Amino acid sequence: MKKAIILILSTALIYGCGSSNDADRQDALPLATEVIDTAISEGELHFAVAAVGNTTGQLWSHSAGHRDAQKTSVAADDNIIQIASMTKLITTIGALQLVERGVLDLDTPITAYVPQLSELRVLEGFDEQDNPILENANRAPTVRELMTHTGGYVYEFWNANAKKASELGVSESLFSGGNYLAAPLAFEAGTAWEYGINTDWLGVIIERISGQRLSVYFDENIFGPLRMVDTFYELPQEKMNRSVTVMARVNDALIELPTLQPAPMAKGSMAHYSGGGGLYSTVADYGRVLQMLLNDGVLDGETLLNPETVDSMFKNNIGDIQLAALGTVMPEVSNTADMSFGNPATFGLGLLLHSEGIEGGRKAYSGSWAGLFNSYYWVDRESKTYGIFGTQILPFFDAASVDTLLKLEQAVYAQNAN
């Protein structure tokens, strides 16, 4: 471990003393650079960008491929991608700031902050005539249960009842533009783990308590203090030329997706800001968030969270509740996804925790998560290392994307161990 830390620090010196061009960043971790380049040269991915850093900042970044389907614009390290559910970590941090200020309590039912949820129901299934079987919920989820995805809210991509409910009009689809937040629970709060729209409700609570729109709260309390200049809900027109086309893998070919493409929007123009997704960012910007967590909540003199709060994020917050792979019911949106990669895992506050680490990679109780368009991150407090990998492909948990992520991770830790 000491050798690993020494190498990381020496890598930082190499990066810090050189110029900031792509060649310097690639030289810092040549094995990682090779992983990204190979994924592109072999045609597995159309675009890839990645970064690795530690407590001192970004040590390495690299991009390859093209940011457009026509392959006219070469990829760059500062390309802006849709990070989708990587938004959830930002929302969790924002909510934990309110906990520290004493205006939000982790173990209080969310009805204290959103009274209209006082009559929640649980969708038990459907009868023979396809009528929904809805039962009154025993209680509302707590704020902690929203952060840990034990609140009972799910996604229609991985839950058959939720998918059927949206098809029959019992609830709105996430893609409909309607009131998808009104969906019933899939199970009683605190009884199971399933990934879902829990963090979307957390965003609503932040807005209710702060009196600000979520985008404004993030700008003032997270993006501004961390000097994140390329993270936003509305993509500015002047930054469109750094955005990346979303592709779909169909019959082993990558084609341009007809929807969900990046589009410019005026700042403050969105009707709804989701705590569960919707942000654009770069690997450099998002790395600032992970670097802050490695520094126990502080970065460049700005304190975003107290050390004790950061500690709580990386502790098991779900007890004996077991995580399970997300079995797909919408294969065009997501493959079956095992975010533990076959290793023991639990859940902290806003983070999946690898309770025993990954052999040859991230250490025990490292945190991680991902975004729908196949962007992934990990933050390893033991090794003081973070990693980010991103492409823009559907469906989620794309085999080539996950393979590249894991090879990247192995390359980073292999080099640090030598």
Task: Place the predicted regions along the sequence by residue.
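Acidic helix-start/capping segments at beta-turn-to-alpha-helix junctions
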Residues: 53-54, 109-121, 310-312
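Short, surface-exposed loop or secondary-structure junction motifs
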Residues: 120-359
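Short, conserved catalytic-motif segment at the N-terminal edge
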Residues: 25-83, 103, 122-128, 398
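Sec-dependent N-terminal signal peptides
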Residues: 4-12
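C-terminal motif of bacterial Sec signal peptides marking the signal peptidase cleavage site
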Residues: 15-16
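C-terminal soluble interaction/assembly domains
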Residues: 389-390
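Active-site SXXK
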Residues: 36, 56, 82-110, 199-207, ...
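Short, surface-exposed beta-strand/loop micro-motifs that present aromatic residues
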Residues: 366, 373-386
